[in-house]
Amino acid sequence: MLSAGRIVSTPSGSRLSRRDFLAVMSAAVSTACWREAPFDRRAFTPPARSAVGLFAAASYSADLADIIFRGFRELGVNVAGRRVFLKPNMVEYEPGTAINTHPAVVAGAIAACRRGGAAEVVVGEGPGHRRDIEYLLSSTGLYDYLREERVRFVDLNHDDVKVMPTKSWFTSLRDIALPVSLLQSDFIITMPKLKTHHWAGMTCSMKNLFGVVPGAVYGWPKNLLHMRGVFESILDLTATIQPHLTIVDAITAMEGDGPIMGKPRPLGFVAIGSDLPAVDATCARVIGLDPVKVPYLPPASRYLGNIDTRRIDQRAESPDRFATRFELIPSLEHLRLTDR
């Protein structure tokens, strides 16, 4: 079995050697018995209270750098001297849809981090559907901005990986191969697009972490994670990676048959917070879902954060300002809040 901490090279455009591939797979499919608790309690200090900021942004032409930087100040986010890693949600090629995190939000986050004194800002994604990363970048409009601003982009599907022990055990995985570029950063920001999801109910800060694990190891669209359970994998990834912040693109979200075939739905805000379950629970309530019914959120509230409104301090705008009854596919109707 591949020992935790070993770095395996997966250069872009090539495959793992058979030996390294089998070693990584051996770690990935380990079926060791669950420990006493599903979380490594030593790795977590659950917050007593959490702050979630909803910042109005009527369109993508708004000054998103200023909006996000204001969020940093209101929430006490400090990136000074940090190596910041931004992980947007990039799925399909079609620009102008509600599938991807909008390039303007990514650009705004880069500018806000630089204004906050970040030592370096890197952007990375490991798309599960489309493997031509250069075309994906150019077609989404992000390539030109990154080139002009000299921001490095990392294809996480083919980055070198380091096998890390998981910090929760909802799946049978006891180790996860994570990109070295992500691990070398010291401030990780997940940047999802708020969407419904036909399997997970919704995709937001936590589900976005599926794009961190390399397709060169876990397949497309990250099949080895799906096989072990979508909800369970969301929890294990969040517990193990532990991002420092989330910036949610909810300026235009997606309802219906998300995360790809749904319809755009303008909401007009950016959500920011360091407690991922709290941010996801807040976004769920905005679109009319009950966080207690979204399967991965109640377990997450045990160690990773808060989902109870009594423990969440809302900053900037009230969620009621953006509250919307999202269209859902029939299999997700049971997730609705009873009062909407």
Task: Go through each PLM region and give its residues.
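N-terminal and secondary-structure boundary signal
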Residues: 2-340
